[in-house]
Amino acid sequence: MNKFATLAVIFCACIVGSCYANYGGQQSYGQRSYGQDSSAASAASSAAAAGAEGQQRYERPVEIIAGGYRGSYAPEILRPIQVSGGYGGERRGYNGGNYRRAGYGPRWTVQPAGATLLYPGQNNYKAYVSPPEYSKVILPIRPAAPVAKLFVPENQYGNQYVSQYSAPRSSGY
């Protein structure tokens, strides 16, 4: 029984070791940044080794930094998004060409700089609109001269003429 258990443990260790053979081994990453995968590097090396014979064309992966100003004052973590392989672009099977299998997540594409969004909100592009800034101008306010001399009853304009042409009033009858 003890020999059987020992052989079973050794057999399972061999199976697990063959599944994860390169897990703890040495890997040559080179100058890689966050978000790149090793299949792109292997595709570049195989395309360079093929030389003029190979018709394979290697396209470099493009990274778009997602995030930025969204109306809040809190800093947001910027993370790179890999355009080439994020939607199954480099996993080309026997169909070849531009066939892409359906993947998860948004379809990120590269938008040319200075492009105008014709239909905003219908794609994954984010339009960055700066808040409006108004210039502050202080205008001098001075009271203007009166346009006309208006009749005000409290001033009693015209009373000086009444006393000249009218008879004096007598208080006793």
Curated annotation (Swiss-Prot):
Primary location recorded for the protein, binned into one broad class: secreted
A Gene Ontology biological process term: chorion-containing eggshell formation
This protein's GO CC annotations: egg chorion; extracellular region
Secreted among keywords: yes
Protein name: Chorion protein S19
Keywords for the protein's UniProt record, in alphabetical order: Secreted, Signal
InterPro entries (alphabetical): Chorion_2 (IPR005649)
GO MF annotation list: structural constituent of egg chorion
Residues of the signal peptide: 1-21
Gene name, Swiss-Prot/TrEMBL: Cp19
Flavoprotein keyword on record: no
Family: Belongs to the chorion protein S19 family.
Pfam families cross-referenced by the UniProt entry: Chorion_2
Annotated localization: Secreted
Function text: Chorion membrane (egg shell) protein; plays a role in protecting the egg from the environment.
